[in-house]
Each structure stands twice: as C-alpha cells, then as structure tokens.
Regions:
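The first (N-terminal) embedded transmembrane alpha-helix
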Residues: 1-7
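Alpha-helical transmembrane segments
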Residues: 7-10, 35, 147-154
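Juxtamembrane segments at transmembrane-helix boundaries
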Residues: 8-128
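Alpha-helical transmembrane segments of polytopic membrane proteins
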Residues: 24-30, 135-145
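Juxtamembrane or sensor-core-proximal signal-transducing alpha helices
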Residues: 124-126, 143-169
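Conserved nucleotide-binding and Mg2+-coordinating catalytic segments in signaling enzymes
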Residues: 175-185
Length: 185
C-alpha cells in the first residue's frame, strides 16, 4: 500500500504541475482513502479492501483520461490490475472462488481500459496538458505498469514454488512415516 500511496503523490504533483488542480486534489484524497483501505486490511476485511482498490484504479483511469487524455497513459493501470488480480485471488484466503474472481476482476479492469479508450475517441480532454508532459507521464505510467506486472508475476511464481516445496516436504514426511507404520506395510 505504501507504493500505491507514493504513486498517487507522484500523480498529485504531476497534476498540480500541469494545472489540473482538481485531479491533484483527487489524488491527495486517494492517498487518504488508501490509508483507510490499509485499515481494512489490518481488520482482516481484505475482500472489501481489494474491491475498493479495483474500483479506485478504474475510476482514476477514467477521470485521468477525461481530464488529460488517453495519451497520458493512466489507463495502463487497468492492464496491470490483471496481474494483481491473479496474484491476490490466488494468495489471499478470502477469495474462495479464485478463478471466477480473477476473471471478474480482470474483466472489470479490461472494461475500465476500454471505457478510457472510447472516451478518448468521443471526448476531448477537459484540461489538455502540453505534449511533452503527456509523453513524460505516458512513459512514467508505462514504466510503473511494467514494474507492477513484473513484481506481481514474480510474487505469484514465488508463492507457487513455495507451496510446491511445502507439499513435496509434506509428502516426503508422510512417506517416511508410512515406512515406519506397521499398518501401511
């Protein structure tokens, strides 16, 4: 959550620096909201925390697209959320139907991406920013997207390998016990 907070502080600075004050204020509000989401996680309300996070990412992408345009790249976080959803629904125990929930969260993220795209076709940005600022923000957003995807895929691989190693160790332990147990001979 700290990384998400830092990311939204970066967004707030970008928006204020480019004169999109309302999005700067929105990002400060999101920083505060993420502190509340962190409290939900501490209270073991992880399902609600993740649902709120998914909604926030899509809403932020849509608002940023409306204000500064598709070319700034805020919609790429919807793509990153697919990798996050795969990891979270696999690891967090509150997700009982991992595959179904992964699909639902991923579809919601894809929907958000395409809403941003359609908005860019039919709506001019409310507060267009200079082309250089757009390019810089697109590069920053794409870089963060790749980092998020890489980190969550690596976490997923690590978790799968860890579970596999634990299962193999348990099987070895059971094999050893069965060799000593007269009932299994």
């Amino acid at each position: 959550m700290n990384a998400v907070t830092i990311l939204h502080v970066v967004f707030a600075i970008f928006f204020w620096a480019t004169g999109v004050t309302i999005m700067g204020v929105y990002n400060v509000a999101i920083v505060v909201a993420y502190q509340g989401i962190l409290m939900l996680i501490k209270k073991k309300k992880t399902y609600l925390a993740y649902v709120l996070t998914c909604i926030e990412v899509v809403v932020h992408a849509v608002l940023a697209t409306l204000f500064v345009g598709f070319s700034s790249g805020f919609q790429v976080y919807c793509v990153a959320m697919i990798a996050v959803s795969c990891y979270i629904t696999f690891v967090w125990e509150c997700f009982k139907n991992g595959t179904r929930e992964t699909l639902l969260f991923s579809l919601f993220s894809m929907f958000g991406y395409f809403v941003c795209y359609v908005l860019s076709l039919y709506c001019e940005p409310i507060k267009p920013v200079h082309e250089i600022a757009q390019t810089i923000m697109y590069i920053v957003n794409a870089l963060f997207m790749f980092i998020i995807i890489f980190c969550f895929v690596m976490l997923l691989f690590w978790d799968i390998n860890h579970r596999s190693d634990r299962l193999a160790a348990k099987n070895n332990q059971l094999d050893e016990m069965s060799k000593k147990d007269p009932l299994t001979k």
